[in-house]
Amino acid sequence: MTNIHYHKILILDFGSQYTQLIARRVREIGVYCELWAWDVTEQQIREFAPTGIILSGSPESTTEENSPRAPEYVFNAGVPVLGICYGMQTMAMQLGGLTETSDHREFGYASVSLENSTALFANLNDNLTASEPKLDVWMSHGDKVTRLPENFKVTGTTLTCPIAAMSDESRRFYGVQFHPEVTHTKKGLELLTNFVVNICGCETKWTAENIIEDAVARIKEQVGDDEVILGLSGGVDSSVVALLLHRAIGKNLHCVFVDNGLLRLHEGDQVMEMFGDKFGLNITRVDAESRFLGELAGVSDPEAKRKIIGKVFVDVFDDESKKLTNVKWLAQGTIYPDVIESAASKTGKAHVIKSHHNVGGLPDYMKLGLVEPLRELFKDEVRKIGLALGLPAEMINRHPFPGPGLGVRVLGEVKKEYCDLLRRADAIFIEELRNSGWYEKTSQAFSVFLPVKSVGVMGDGRKYDWVISLRAVETIDFMTAHWAHLPYDLLGKVSNRIINEVNGISRVVYDISGKPPATIEWE
């Protein structure tokens, strides 16, 4: 079997907003990598045995006392090192160079003139000006290297940054003041490929097929002939976990699908058809709608609703698990960003991830071992594996759906009547987005039930019914978002269909709030 972890890159995180993007680019090249806090020990690096090391950017300044530094062993490990932005600056300082606060900060696009040959820039240039090769890059820095360490040479300059790139070819140390990991740097992926593949010598074994083979083998080794239980929601993560486990252990996997009455139109039937009929999984559907809605009765506070939904899920899942006396393992859809955010740095700067609604409160007495086949993978990698396992693209690329489901898209108290109206309205909205080609152009689109009534006219009579708000946004990272400028004709068609086809809705409005100041979801 292919050893997909033999060649690997260690990325030391100094706190840049782009650090996870570096890791995703390295994985995209086809090489395994891990992202660790900058304050790792020499022993940890030795045990990981990286083929190469990348130092990330940072919001910190190398000119400040007590700013983070790379472990000294990084430069004595005998492997190539690439410093990006702050990573280049700390490399320069730690090896005897000098950095200073720049008089001219660079934020945004810049053109780097390439000087002196370097393996990092081999066969790279965006344009030639008077026979001088240039790279179009993305800068984001306030400090700059003003004196090179011994044996380094300048390999790139800009008008305001004389040392925009540097290298020591003999030790295979490289620094770039710009960010090759962002798409704004046009040849960024090629630059990282030069480092990871050509300089570090990594083989590109990190592929969907190899990852599946490795995951299945590791599951078999971990659980043997034991039985495993999984809460299958129909979302991408739990679906991919289910198919990996099914491939590894077959009928020893017990999937529990909790139908909480807060799902999209026909979603419960679709999950059963997909995983029970098509893939032949051992799956139990629990109709818990009345239980969830009963607990939610009279509750309007969004956070209280989330907690109730999470608690009831745990109770229902626990009831089902008690029926399975031989289960020894609990499978979860933990992915790599969860692992990164949960990791505690000894500096205390690491973030603690929010608890997931469906795994955060499992009873201690269940005492099951954890199986987490996706814990090394980013979300985009999970999607690629899902496609390779046979999940339909329409499901893999579906817009995000909140864990509490319609519980946070029905504003205020959640009632069955409201959920039923919202399900039908939302299905019409999504159908028309798909028909018009706008579903793929938006990052997330959904309907919201507003618990207010509005006067309308239907035929010769007046009616006094509920209001639906449509929401569609465009975003790259979901940290910020713009409202989608859907065509008026499309919005008009959706509105007419909802009002005419969903009895109980009298008015449809469109949410034109960005994030910030608004959040994407209403609750």
Swiss-Prot record:
Record carries keyword Signal: no
Residue runs in coiled coils: none
Keyword set, alphabetical order: ATP-binding, Glutamine amidotransferase, GMP biosynthesis, Ligase, Nucleotide-binding, Purine biosynthesis
Keyword match ATP-binding: yes
Domain GMPS ATP-PPase residues, every copy: 206-398
GO biological process, one term: GMP biosynthetic process
Pathway: Purine metabolism; GMP biosynthesis; GMP from XMP (L-Gln route): step 1/1
Residues reported to bind ATP: S233, G234, G235, V236, D237, S238, S239
SUPFAM superfamilies in the record: Adenine nucleotide alpha hydrolases-like, Class I glutamine amidotransferase-like, GMP synthetase C-terminal dimerisation domain
Catalyses which reaction(s): XMP + L-glutamine + ATP + H2O = GMP + L-glutamate + AMP + diphosphate + 2 H(+)
Residue numbers annotated as active site: C85, H179, E181
Pfam assignment, any one: GMP_synt_C
GO annotation, cellular component aspect: cytosol
Enzyme Commission number, as recorded: 6.3.5.2
Residue ranges of domain Glutamine amidotransferase type-1 in the record: 8-205
GO molecular function, one term: GMP synthase activity
Its biological purpose: Catalyzes the synthesis of GMP from XMP.
Subunit organization: Homodimer.
NCBIfam families: guaA_Cterm, guaA_Nterm, PRK00074.1
Full protein name: GMP synthase [glutamine-hydrolyzing]
Species of origin: Haemophilus influenzae (strain ATCC 51907 / DSM 11121 / KW20 / Rd)
